């Protein structure tokens, strides 16, 4: 979480002009983004399993856009711009969460038949996030196709997870 928040600070500081933010707002938004993200994964896990101790990364994927919408309305900024700038923050934080899955030993893939080795589903998801960050960050910086960043992420993530779930 700390690593994700630090990334958010650096990324949002670079992008503060697009969202017309003061430097201190970058710090507040970075911490809020992480806190809302944690609440999102906890709430979604509770809705899925009834257990508040679990986490589900789908919470971040599905609830964060609602938080972005609320933030855009409260600060009178275009929703598409808020989504474009904050999507890399969400991607990086989700990537850190998957790294935590490796460290804690959860979310491993199915055992490969005839071996004791698991399919590297967590590792593939981390690789997916790295590739998406490499592809999306330049698009956000150049404001290429405004408003397309989050939908592009969702479409690719949906396709990735559809395939990944066969091995989870």
Residue positions per predicted region:
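Hydrophobic, membrane-interfacing alpha helices
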Residues: 1-168
């Amino acid at each position: 979480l700390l690593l994700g928040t630090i990334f958010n600070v650096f990324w949002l500081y670079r992008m503060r002009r697009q969202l017309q933010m003061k430097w201190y707002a970058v710090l507040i938004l970075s911490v809020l983004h992480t806190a809302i993200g944690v609440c999102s994964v906890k709430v979604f896990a509770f809705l899925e399993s009834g257990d508040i101790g679990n986490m589900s990364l789908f919470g971040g994927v599905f609830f964060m856009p609602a938080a972005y919408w609320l933030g855009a309305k409260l600060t009178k900024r275009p929703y598409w711009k808020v989504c474009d700038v904050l999507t890399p923050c969400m991607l990086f934080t989700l990537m850190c969460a998957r790294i935590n899955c490796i460290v804690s030993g959860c979310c491993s893939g199915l055992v490969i038949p005839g071996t004791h080795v698991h399919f590297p589903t967590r590792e593939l998801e981390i690789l997916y996030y790295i590739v998406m960050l490499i592809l999306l960050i330049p698009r956000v910086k150049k404001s290429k196709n405004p408003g397309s960043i989050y939908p592009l992420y969702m479409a690719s993530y949906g396709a990735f997870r559809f395939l990944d779930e066969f091995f989870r």
